[in-house]
Amino acid sequence: MIAEIVTIGDEILIGQVVDTNSAYISKELNKIGVSVHQITSIEDDRTHILQTLKEASQRADIIIITGGLGPTKDDITKKCLCEFFDDKLVRNKKVLKHIEELFDKYIDTPISDLNRDQALLPSKAIALHNEYGTAAGMWFDNGGKVYISMPGVPYEMRGLMEREIIPRLMQNYSRPVILHKTVVTYGLGESAIAEKIESWEDNLPKEIKLAYLPNLGRVRLRLSARGDNEDHLRNLIDSQITALHEYIGDIIFGYEDEDPVEVVIGKMLAERNWSLSTAESFTGGRLASKFTKAPGSSASFKGSLVCYFTEAKKELLNVSEELIKKHSVVSAEVAKAMAQGARDKFHTEFAIATTGNAGPSKGDSDADLGTVFIGIATPDGVTAHQFNFGNHREKVVGKSVNKAMELLQQSVIKFTKND
């Protein structure tokens, strides 16, 4: 089945709001074998909405619409759907009851007629229960096509996808099996990897497609398989990844579709009752955030210090003023001192530290823009690694976080082998 997503809202087109909904919807549809072939963002304009719905219906089996279901005059999606389906709005008693209950339980202001009017739905629509908001989702079967309308609020849309839309699609429509496995690599660019795996890629089975996805110092290789037999496709992908290891096994970092690297590191640490801390300068807590977002991180991650200011490095991490004066704040020596300071402060087996010059100015150091030092403290001692990640601040920060994770994983693996 082919799907098309239509997002409605001026706020998306002027860049005020980033469209994260389409990425989520596409990912969830792909999991159940529905392919998204096009995503279109349009303004809150009647003519534009009607024309887009007409065009989408000629390309797709499922048309998913988000946005324009609020209570104000600029929310015109329901009126446009009525015009498109030659329908009229009628009050849905079940939806109205839900709206009144939400106001009674959670909203301090009195319910207004505008709020009650959100229970007006096209008569041909099947109402989809929105547990988290007042705008009901809508499902239309028309001319062999499915049209689905949802609010643009991300958590409301996700609730409808999980509880209403995905279950209905799975129950009512047969779909092919689509499987993905994404190999995460480091240390080589995509062109260098392509050269190393050329013969492997040329001999991939016809059911498998390969995509190169470079991002912030890593290259992801996504293998996608499509067919009718899930076990066959899964075995096919696994066998190809086994073969891939013969070509680039030394730079394979992990698998994106399984546990992310921060979870893998956390599990390795927790299994041995080891712990981790971080000390960060220009990365501003991004490294610690990777770990705290991971489920179960409290079993191994003790804490972090963000020491952006030079004085903070001295006061909180015991980095000596003499060391800073001699080597500068962006140096291997300071990176090592920061890592050791974090290890001592939090009493952890492992600690990792970042110091660098992400730009746009040089700050407290004469180091070139993009210069980064990553320090790692382990039970065996402290090491530091130097890199230069260019002159784009966000790119420098992102690459530094990724590289720090790689170095940490390598250090932990080394100790697990000796354990």
UniProtKB/Swiss-Prot annotation:
This is CinA-like protein. SMART domains: MoCF_biosynth. It comes from the Bacteria. It holds the Pfam family CinA. Signal peptide: none annotated. Belongs to the CinA family. NCBIfam families: cinA_nterm (TIGR00200), molyb_syn (TIGR00177), PncC_domain (TIGR00199), PRK00549.1 (NF001813). Transmembrane segments: none annotated.
